[in-house]
């Protein structure tokens, strides 16, 4: 039999794709007929994922900020709930490895700006080797090896994004993903509430009840938008009403944060314009921002209980200030917090027993038994504290890192913060807001400042890295690009100076 040797690769691809499509159609049809919807969703998800990677091509890395910028629903896989970012980063890692093997990309690991992240990761790896957790735990929704998995994927995302170079258009796409993520998260959470689905805490797995439940999700999208506004436009542009819609958006974000119940989020909302005024060197707007913040909060605090009654969740946001609040907030009035106090006590005890190394995310039977006894003892705070302690959500970054992995890890995290802030300052000083590189640098500076502000009330050794290291990797790449540009400009200036000097010498010699 003679075969046509002129069959092209696209023709082969179409034939193979058609055959696979027909086979998959039969498979899906039988699954739907058998009402095996878990298998249907799994297959459709796989096709969508593969299609996304093929469509993006060399821009496959965009799936990392896209997946981490929004709260996508978990994907059922093998009887376990797998988060979309976990699959996205795993897929990106596989493609990155393949492109390294084919010399289309380079992996850059050992350079000075990577040292803080490398030290952090090496320390976590050492503790894991000393106190390992079985691989079966990767199926857990919270705790144990799932946190190690997230740290490993966060490190992979950092390496992938820090080893690339970016254009202005790439950074604009990233901000587009962040805005999309903020909008999607709002719509998804509101839809879940409207459909009656229970709100599950992502750290403990507990169902949240009461007035302070889904409201918490309002703060993250609002802060994303406010941080972007403060990074892209100077205070003069905002307050001079050159773009009046910016102030309108800020007011909407203020109301969202107020209704979120997040006390520290309100402080971050007012912090962003102040940092922007300092970075843009428009210092007069520091006082303008402070005046507006005092007027807004003062009106709400003074008016509460006299002129109007705020919703309970809004009162919670302001409860750290002295005011006429509902008795519901007696235990947290003035900044007091019995819940965090109990968590800090447990974390401090762990640090006393394991000050240098800690035991990582390993959970033994004694901790589980203690949590059960605490829950059986009675009070609502006791039940919450037990679940959060097992989930390593200490609500204090420094105590939490030290309790999990020893005091040295807290020191390493502080070094990471300093390194990130310094790189942000240098990148913004070089690019300013005229380039999206500078906008991202200032955005991350504000974001990191918020992290430091809230370090005594929030934080998780694994989740922090999971949500932030991809941004650190992007910053490292932009910082290295900036250094190369500055070096190139100095070399060019030096050559031009040498050429002018040589030209003058020739002219002088010709005259004499």
Named regions from a protein language model:
Residues 199, 330-345, 349-353, 357-405, ...:
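Long extracytoplasmic/lumenal interhelical loops at the membrane interface
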Residues 2-4, 8-14, 20-23, 45-52, ...:
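Alpha-helical transmembrane segments of multi-pass inner-membrane proteins
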Residues 1-10, 16, 241, 426-441, ...:
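A juxtamembrane structural motif centered on a specific transmembrane helix
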Residues 248-251, 392-396, 403, 414-416, ...:
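Loop-to-helix entry and N-terminal half of a specific, functionally important transmembrane alpha helix
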Residues 4-102, 126-133:
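N-terminal signal-anchor transmembrane segment
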Residues 259-260, 277-332, 349-353, 361:
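A membrane-periplasm/extracellular boundary helix in multi-pass inner-membrane enzymes
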Residues 27-40, 77-88, 212-216, 244-285, ...:
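Helix-loop-helix junctions and helix-breaking kinks within/between transmembrane helices
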Residues 82-93, 112-129, 136-163, 173, ...:
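Aromatic-anchored transmembrane helix interface
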């Amino acid at each position: 039999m003679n075969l046509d040797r002129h069959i092209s690769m696209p023709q082969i691809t179409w034939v193979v794709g058609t055959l696979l499509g027909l086979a998959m159609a039969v498979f899906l049809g039988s699954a739907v007929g058998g009402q095996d919807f878990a298998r249907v969703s799994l297959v459709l998800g796989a096709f969508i994922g593969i299609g996304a990677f093929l469509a993006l091509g060399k821009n496959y890395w965009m799936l990392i900020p896209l997946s981490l910028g929004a709260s996508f629903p978990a994907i059922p896989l093998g009887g376990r709930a797998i988060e979309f970012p976990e699959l996205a980063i795993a897929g990106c890692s596989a493609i990155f490895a393949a492109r390294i093997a084919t010399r289309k990309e380079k992996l850059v690991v050992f350079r000075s700006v990577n040292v803080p992240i490398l030290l952090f990761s090496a320390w976590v790896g050492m503790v894991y080797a000393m106190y390992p957790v079985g691989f079966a735990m990767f199926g857990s929704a919270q705790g144990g090896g799932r946190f190690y998995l997230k740290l490993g994927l966060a490190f992979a995302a950092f390496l992938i994004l820090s080893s690339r170079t970016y254009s202005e258009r790439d950074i604009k796409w990233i901000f587009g993903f962040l805005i999309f993520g903020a909008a999607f998260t709002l719509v998804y959470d509101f839809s879940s509430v409207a459909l009656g689905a229970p709100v599950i805490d992502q750290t403990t797995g507990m169902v949240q009840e009461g007035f302070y439940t889904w409201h918490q999700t309002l703060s993250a999208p609002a802060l994303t938008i406010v941080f972007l506004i403060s990074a892209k436009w100077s205070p003069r542009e905002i307050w001079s009403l050159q773009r009046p819609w910016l102030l309108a958006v800020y007011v909407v974000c203020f109301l969202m944060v107020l209704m979120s119940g997040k006390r520290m989020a309100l402080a971050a909302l007012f912090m962003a314009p102040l940092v922007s005024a300092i970075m843009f060197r428009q210092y007069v707007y520091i006082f303008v921002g402070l005046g507006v913040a005092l007027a807004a909060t003062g009106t709400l605090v003074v008016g509460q209980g006299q002129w109007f009654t705020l919703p309970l969740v809004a009162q919670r946001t302001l409860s750290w200030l002295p005011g006429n609040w509902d008795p519901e907030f007696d235990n947290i009035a003035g900044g007091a917090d019995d819940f965090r106090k109990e968590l800090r006590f447990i974390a401090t005890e762990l640090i006393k027993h394991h000050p240098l190394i800690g035991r990582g995310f390993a959970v033994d039977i004694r901790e589980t038994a203690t949590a059960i006894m605490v829950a059986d003892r009675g009070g609502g705070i006791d039940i919450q504290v037990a679940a959060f302690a097992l989930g390593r959500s200490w609500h204090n970054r420094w105590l939490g890192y030290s309790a999990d992995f020893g005091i040295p890890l807290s020191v390493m995290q502080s070094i990471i913060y300093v390194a990130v802030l310094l790189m942000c300052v240098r990148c913004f000083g070089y690019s300013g807001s005229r380039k999206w590189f500078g906008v991202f640098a200032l955005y991350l500076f504000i974001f990191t400042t918020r992290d430091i502000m809230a370090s005594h009330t929030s934080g998780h050794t694994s989740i922090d890295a999971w949500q932030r290291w991809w941004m650190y990797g992007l910053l490292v790449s932009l910082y290295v690009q900036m250094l190369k540009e500055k070096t190139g400009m100095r070399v060019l200036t030096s050559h031009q100076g040498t050429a002018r000097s040589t030209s003058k010498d020739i002219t002088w010699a010709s005259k004499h």
